[in-house]
Design a protein with these regions (language model features):
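Short, small-residue-biased leader/transition segments that mark boundaries at the very start
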Residues: 1-6
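General membrane topology signal spanning transmembrane segments
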Residues: 8-10
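Glycine-rich, charge-dense phosphate/pyrophosphate-binding loop(s)
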Residues: 13-175
Length: 176
């Protein structure tokens, strides 16, 4: 039906961008097979092991642009947390100040590889802005990591991070 045509058109239009797709009736075709190149890395012991960052969503959150008055509030929260506001990356943004999502994530206490352990989805071990499937993660598990990071940045600084990939048939629950 028309819904299937629309889904195919959206997927074709967005195929050059990141997407998280779940739900029934959606087939992502024409994207090619995943490549095995770069899937292995050398461990500190000199052994080849699977690279946990191979299957990445790339940059998961956009850099937020906030208004000047909100920026003043954010600076106060950052300063109250004992963080030097002079080192905070900030740039002129359309209609306000653009902040670095990666910096906010780091400063909110989310380190590379969060949550660690055996959880199947995590922040990349190379960059806190990328989410990775460590091999067996479900969409729900990936979005749970994204939710925890988004909520943590919100609680610490009052800045809402917005996903960069288009979420099709799934979502991150709204902030409380």
């Amino acid at each position: 039906g028309l819904g299937d045509v629309y889904k195919r058109q959206v997927l074709e239009l967005r195929r050059g961008k990141g997407m998280v797709v779940c739900g029934s009736g959606v087939r992502a075709t024409g994207f090619g097979e995943p490549s095995a190149s770069g899937v292995w890395v050398e461990s500190p012991a000199g052994q080849l092991v699977p690279d946990p960052d191979t299957f990445s969503t790339g940059s998961f959150f956009t850099n937020p642009v906030i208004c000047e008055s909100m920026f003043t509030d954010v600076l106060e929260q950052i300063s109250a947390a004992g963080i030097d506001t002079d080192v905070m990356p900030k740039f002129p943004g359309q209609g306000g100040v653009k902040l670095s999502a990666a910096w906010l994530i780091d400063q909110a206490g989310f380190s590379k590889g969060f949550p660690g352990g055996e959880y199947p989805a995590s922040l990349s071990t190379r960059h806190t802005l990328a989410l990775t499937n460590r091999g067996s993660a479900t969409t729900a598990e990936l979005l749970e990591v994204a939710r925890r990071v988004r909520d943590g940045v919100w609680e610490r600084f009052g800045v809402e991070l917005v996903p960069e990939p288009i979420l099709v048939g799934c979502s991150i629950p709204p902030l409380d």
